[in-house]
Amino acid sequence: MRHLLAATLMLLAACSGGQTVSLTVDDAHYRPPLVDGGTGVAYFAITSKIADRIVAVSSPRARAVEIHESTSDQGMAVMELRPGVDLPPGKTVKFEPGGLHLMVIAPQPLTAGATFPIQIELESGRVQTIAFAGAPAS
């Protein structure tokens, strides 16, 4: 529930310019890298009321953020960079282990109790910042 509340508050703040909120984000959580300078990963579920497309992702706390998808090809696990992800109206798109996910490259360390911000840029021109709940790497 805490994950949903944080993500919802960030979405509301991003849309406070008279726009209606047309995105819902659930279970936004971030796994930091095991070693400094490594790669973290972020997972979430997103639902758009209108047809849209995620065209870019970024974070002020990382060198880069990329959309990746894990698949299986002839029994071998394959991870591919995706240029974007379609958001069909009313359908939930899940970013989860073994499928779509965000790779967070060279992120700054996360302190206890902090969230990790990731911006999602949509084809419609909207930009949403999502606060991903996480825990410091141990």
Protein language model features and the residues they cover:
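Bacterial signal peptide processing site
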Residues: 15-19
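Compact, glycine-rich, soluble single-domain proteins
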Residues: 22-138
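Positively charged n-region of N-terminal signal peptides that target proteins for export
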Residues: 1-4
